[in-house]
C-alpha cells in the first residue's frame, strides 16, 4: 500500500428510500461480508418497526437517536515526560458520526432480541429516548473526558 498520498475520502451516495447519506452509512455499518441486500433489508425493516411503534417518521427518530449518541469530547493518550496522560479533545464532526454509528451497531448486535432488525429498532428507539447502552457509552466517554480535564493543557 502506497504511503505517498492519503487515500481520498469517497462520497457516500444517499439511499434511495429516505434520500439520506446517514442511512447509507448505517447500512454500510450493518453490512457483513459485502451482503448489502441483507443489510438494507435489516435497516429498512428496523425503520418500519420504528414507524409502527412510534407513529412518527423513522428517519426523524433515527436522527434524534444519532444526536443523543454522538460524542462531543473523547480522551486521547498523550505521552509526556515518560508517562501517558488521557487528554480530553473535541471530536471532529466526521468522527462524531462514525463513532455514533459504530457504537449503535455494535451495541445493537449485543442485545438479546431475536433478530438484528428487532435489536437495531429497539436500540434506535432507546437512543432517541436518551436511554440504552449506546447513550451510556457516550456518557461514559464524556465522563472520562471530564475526569481528565486537568490534562487539557497537554492538547496538541
UniProtKB/Swiss-Prot annotation:
Domain of life from the UniProt record: Bacteria
GO BP, sorted A to Z: translation
A GO CC term attached to the entry: small ribosomal subunit
Entry GO MF terms: rRNA binding; structural constituent of ribosome; tRNA binding
Swiss-Prot/TrEMBL keywords: Ribonucleoprotein, Ribosomal protein, RNA-binding, rRNA-binding, tRNA-binding
Function: One of the primary rRNA binding proteins, it binds directly to 16S rRNA where it nucleates assembly of the head domain of the 30S subunit. Is located at the subunit interface close to the decoding center, probably blocks exit of the E-site tRNA.
PANTHER family xrefs: RIBOSOMAL PROTEIN S7
Subunit structure: Part of the 30S ribosomal subunit. Contacts proteins S9 and S11.
Protein's UniProt name: Small ribosomal subunit protein uS7
Species annotation: Streptococcus gordonii (strain Challis / ATCC 35105 / BCRC 15272 / CH1 / DL1 / V288)
Amino acid at each position: 500500500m502506497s504511503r505517498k498520498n492519503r487515500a481520498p475520502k469517497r462520497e457516500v451516495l444517499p439511499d434511495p428510500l429516505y434520500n439520506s447519506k446517514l442511512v447509507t452509512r448505517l447500512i454500510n455499518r450493518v453490512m457483513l461480508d459485502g451482503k448489502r441486500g441483507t443489510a438494507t433489508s435489516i435497516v429498512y425493516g428496523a425503520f418500519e418497526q420504528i414507524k409502527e411503534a412510534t407513529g412518527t417518521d423513522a428517519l426523524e427518530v433515527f436522527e434524534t437517536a444519532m444526536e443523543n449518541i454522538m460524542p462531543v469530547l473523547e480522551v486521547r493518550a498523550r505521552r509526556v515526560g515518560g508517562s501517558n496522560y488521557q487528554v480530553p479533545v473535541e471530536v471532529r464532526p466526521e468522527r462524531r458520526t462514525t463513532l455514533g454509528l459504530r457504537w449503535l451497531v455494535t451495541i445493537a448486535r449485543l442485545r438479546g432480541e431475536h433478530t438484528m432488525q428487532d435489536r437495531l429498532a429497539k436500540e434506535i428507539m432507546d437512543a432517541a429516548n436518551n436511554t440504552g447502552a449506546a447513550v451510556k457509552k457516550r456518557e461514559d466517554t464524556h465522563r472520562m473526558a471530564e475526569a481528565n480535564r486537568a490534562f487539557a493543557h497537554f492538547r496538541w
